Amino acid sequence: MRTHFCGLVDETLIGQTVTLAGWTDVARNQGGVCFIDLRDHEGIVQVTVEVDNAEVFAVAASLGYEDVLQVEGVVRARHAVNDKMRTGKVEVIATAITVLNKAAPLPFHAHENPGEETRLKYRYLDLRRPEMQRMQRTRIKLVQALRRHLDEKGFQDIETPILTKATPEGARDFLVPARMHPGEFYALPQSPQLFKQILMVAGFDRYYQIARCFRDEALRADRQLEFTQLDMEFAFVRERDVQDFVEDMIRGIFKEVVNVELDASFPRMTWAEAMRRYGSDKPDLRIALELVDVAELVKNSEFPVFTGPANDADGRVAALRIPGGASLSRKQIDEYAAHAAKYGAKGLAYIKIADNGEVSSPIQKFFSEESFAALVAHVGAGNGDIVFFGAGGYNKVSDFMGALRLKAGKDFGLVADGWAPLWVTDFPMFEWDEEEQRYVALHHPFTAPAVDDIADLRANARTAVSRGYDMVLNGNEIGGGSIRIHRPDMQSAVFELLGIGAEEARAKFGFLLDALNYGAPPHGGIAFGIDRIAALMAGTESIRDVIPFPKTTGAQDLMTDAPSPIVDAQLAEVHIQVRPKTN
């Protein structure tokens, strides 16, 4: 139906007859001549229809937005060059136009940017927009480049099951009733984690998969119910082997896909250092602001909000200096306090130093003149600055002060241009869940501890460090991995520390424990979020922009109207009866 793509018509074709197909982006009838901007996936070319070709002119004059056309014509040089178009030096003089399909009146035009609900309801129209085409192509190029790199490095692309076993220790599973086994269910995989480990036991050495994963969890801009990850696993490796390989891969992929030169070597930072300096296990290093511990300077003050945590081994009192922050009004300071409260803060103390050196602070009265001056000096505050203080449990203070750091960085224009990758390593093995009164795995239950001795792990579970690692880019965790447990006795011990008894472990993970018993090699791996990396490359904050058919934050597909009710006959086939909703 076509000989050339619209966006690729150029001066080399002048004088030649071409056949094009695409959508009417714009049609303009200027009396003696009609101009049609014809669009396909490669771009736009101007089609010109002259009035002396009466039949073709009549068709052109009747066109509307998004009508689908086939155009035959001769390429000629444009009298008025349009430097804003790739095809701006040429036009196609139409000799025939066939309307392949008329478009109904549109809910929005391809060059408009309507609300997100409208975009998702008419996703097929939204995806025609040039910006959406660009972002989807970025994703496509990313996946193609990853596959090519891994194929060249000897990795094997192996599929793992979509219908699998429900397991604990993660987000909520999506469950699928098993028709042939009444009362029993499959689960959609949250990741291929256990299958890729078993592939290492099976001797495949290097595995990868562009895997679809499913987690029934609350949605936000960077999270979806179903998502795509690059899943990788290596046999006979240590942490640095995995990190060096994927660092080189990510550096090459960014250069190939978006022509970005990442650092020749990514910095490494322990989890403890990241939390201490930045209040986050995924710090955005483009923001130069850092947290400063001040417990030693405030522990003998008369301010009980500070003295309690400052004298508690599990407490923290941290300060954040914001250059130029003295310009904040009382209302704006309250907004910062409200932001911190979302992350667990019960209050936010501050010291504000005006440009003329005048100090205002609700906590100054709790300090001697000397100790207050020492506190100001310790945090490096000067004229024009504000310093926020957080006090409480170590992790909670780190969380809300880290959130303030990000907000301040954006509000005060302190986010540097460019890309800031790093590795965060040495994560805690466990964290204590106050609600359930037990340890939970910080990464997942299959992450190896840094110690090989089970007795040591049991005795020091609270402070145990794992062999986990995350790759962070501009404050986004783009990849997470670890060296895995390959000994069945260690895996059983970790299950036990997580409150998973031997009977439960056998019922839910017996296949893994059995596999580890038959000569499992040391192995490790990593998984990268394709959606998140594509969003960063495309320059959008929402992964929904780089997913062709995403769900809303309300977990709905507005285009297909999913989820939707199921008729009783279908429910009966899978032995399910739905209870009526109750208030």
UniProtKB/Swiss-Prot annotation:
This is Aspartate--tRNA ligase. The lineage of its organism: Bacteria, Pseudomonadati, Pseudomonadota, Gammaproteobacteria, Lysobacterales. Homodimer. Pfam families: GAD, tRNA-synt_2, tRNA_anti-codon. GO terms for cellular component: cytoplasm. InterPro entries: Aa-tRNA-synt_II, aa-tRNA-synth_II, aa-tRNA-synth_II/BPL/LPL, Asp-tRNA-ligase_1, Asp-tRNA-ligase_1_N, Asp/Asn-tRNA-synth_IIb, AspRS_core, GAD-like_sf. Keywords: Aminoacyl-tRNA synthetase, ATP-binding, Cytoplasm, Ligase, Nucleotide-binding, Protein biosynthesis. Belongs to the class-II aminoacyl-tRNA synthetase family. Type 1 subfamily. The gene is aspS. ATP binds at R215, D216, E217, Q224, E477, G529, I530, D531, R532. One of its GO terms (biological process) is aspartyl-tRNA aminoacylation. HAMAP family: Asp_tRNA_synth_type1. Its EC number is 6.1.1.12.
